[in-house]
Every structure is written in C-alpha cells, then in structure tokens.
C-alpha cells in the first residue's frame, strides 16, 4: 500500500474552498486500487491555511493509472489555470511499512 499526499498552502481563510471540492463523491472512488481519501486541515497556521489531501492506494501503479485517466484530467481541469487561492502545493509519496489496527475491547 502507498499513501500519496498533496499539501496545499491556501490564502488565509480560504482553506474551505479546497476542502469543499472534495466533500462529494467523485470519480476517484471508482478507480482500481483506490483504498480511500482523507482531507486534512492543519491546525494553528498563522499566515495561510494548509490543506492536505491524503489518498491510499494498493500500489503506486494504481495511483499513476488515476493520474493518467480522463477522470483525473476532468477533475483537475481548472478554467484559467490554478485557482488563485492556492499559493503552493507539494506532492509526497509514502510506502506504508506498518499498519496497526485497534484491538477489540475486552467484554
């Protein structure tokens, strides 16, 4: 399993604009190898909002299949370029090395 994050710096007070774009079912949910998505808002930033989109995939090839798909191009087509509230962004790939799950509570 891999996790891919896209961390975006957003003009202060506008993080919700990016978050709202992910608050509905999209096309990524239908992609082979897609395991889930979380949208994270960093707490206590002063000069800008920081939003991280974290996606989980069976393999890097599954993520690459998403980025090459017509669905990805459609989801990321910004008329007039990148929205002006996005100051910067960074993509990071992680290999998942250990996963721990909660134990059932004793009865």
UniProtKB/Swiss-Prot annotation:
Catalytic reactions of this protein: heme b + 3 reduced [NADPH--hemoprotein reductase] + 3 O2 = biliverdin IXalpha + CO + Fe(2+) + 3 oxidized [NADPH--hemoprotein reductase] + 3 H2O + H(+)
SUPFAM superfamilies: Dimeric alpha+beta barrel
Binding site for heme: 76
ABM domain mapped to chain residues: 2-94
GO biological process, one term: iron import into cell
Keyword check for Zinc: no
Keywords of the record: Cytoplasm, Heme, Iron, Metal-binding, Monooxygenase, Oxidoreductase
Family annotation (Pfam families): ABM
Compartments where located: Cytoplasm
Keyword Secreted: no
Top-rank lineage group of the source organism: Bacteria
GO molecular function: heme binding; heme oxygenase (decyclizing) activity; iron ion binding
Gene Ontology CC: cytoplasm
Site (Transition state stabilizer): 66
InterPro entries attached to this UniProt entry: ABM_dom, Dimeric_a/b-barrel, Heme-degrading_MO, IsdG
EC annotation from Swiss-Prot or TrEMBL: 1.14.14.18
Residues that, per the record, bind Fe cation: 6
Subunit structure, as described in the record: Homodimer.
Family, similarity comment: Belongs to the antibiotic biosynthesis monooxygenase family. Heme-degrading monooxygenase IsdG subfamily.
Function: Allows bacterial pathogens to use the host heme as an iron source. Catalyzes the oxidative degradation of the heme macrocyclic porphyrin ring to the biliverdin in the presence of a suitable electron donor such as ascorbate or NADPH--cytochrome P450 reductase, with subsequent release of free iron.
Protein name per the record: Heme-degrading monooxygenase
Lineage: Bacteria, Bacillati, Bacillota, Bacilli, Bacillales
